[in-house]
Amino acid sequence: MDIGIIFPQTEIETGKDAIIKFAKTAENLGFSHIFMADHVLGANPAVHEHVRDHYYTHDSIINEVFVTLGFISAITETIGLMTGILILPQRSAALVAK
């Protein structure tokens, strides 16, 4: 059975050292993959009432999916990488297809 781990987008400290520690620890613990959710922009709770209870907003630091997974792929050897969602309208379709 494959068991993965979710990349802690809003909980992880900023900077490469925190990402390195998380990825290498996940790999060393035997997780099969790291799952990363895509959120290019968080919503502003003052304008969008439905997001008031969410854990991320427009002020949250959110790591870009392709850059972060590319970085993790360079520092790990066996762990798989995946996005759980990719918000295409917020990205260039040609770059996503590439």
Task: Say what each PLM segment does.
Residues 1-75:
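N-terminal beta1-alpha1-beta2 module of alpha/beta enzyme domains
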Residues 39, 85-87:
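Residue-level "edge-of-site" marker
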Residues 55-58, 82, 89:
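Residues at structural and domain junctions
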